Amino acid sequence: MRIEIWSDVVCPWCYIGKRRLERALGQFEHAADVEVTWRSFQLNPDTPPGTAVPTLDYLARRFGPQATAMTTQVAELARAEGLDFDFGAALTVNTLDAHRLLHLAADAGVGGAAKERLLRAHFTEGADLSDQDTLTRLLTEAGADEPRVRAVLASDEYADAVRADFDEARMLGANGVPFFVIDRTYGVSGAQSAETFLHALRTAYAAEDAAEDAGAR
């Protein structure tokens, strides 16, 4: 069973949804058969590269007085999942380079570790995920090869793969993230509850089993 997840590393709901999916997988009887693949999606593709805007300022400009209540609510929901969000330190940036490096990490077999490291760095450490030295450090901590990381950052390698993920998200009807697709058949949009994810996993697995049984007859 394959779960593809479209998300951005500066998306709070994506981190919350990741934790809820992980809780569901902890209860799923066939979790050992599940492969998770991370896909790219940018919330702020028009942010100029190299520009880091305090997230609270960015949200205040976009949502006005509601921004404070929004971040307070999201931080509370994150705490329920064991996450300590620090919106006061977070920076809104262009995440294209981060996504290119996540493709590199996936090819190196450390995609999951890299995704978690970048999310944690953004939401709890106030890291600038557009800064190449910061990205190099974080990817290396996740297990990627430092010279390879620097080589990718010095080129446009994996940019086509990132754009292909964007195009595929649109084709699948995803206009927001997180967006989860199970076996290219079942879609789950948003940071749903662990119970919702578990139901989707069991439904998809049962359907796959039934299809295999029918094909064996």
Give residue ranges: language-model regions:
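Short, well-ordered beta-strand elements
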Residues: 1-6, 35-39
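C-terminal cap of thioredoxin/glutaredoxin-like
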Residues: 3-6, 16-30, 103, 107-217
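Short cysteine clusters
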Residues: 11-14
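Structural alpha/beta surface segment adjacent to cysteine/selenocysteine redox centers
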Residues: 19-122, 217
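Short strand-loop junctions, especially beta-strand C-caps/beta-turns
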Residues: 8, 88-90, 185
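A broad, low-specificity signal for short, low-complexity segments enriched in glycine/proline
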Residues: 1, 46-49, 61-65, 138-142, ...
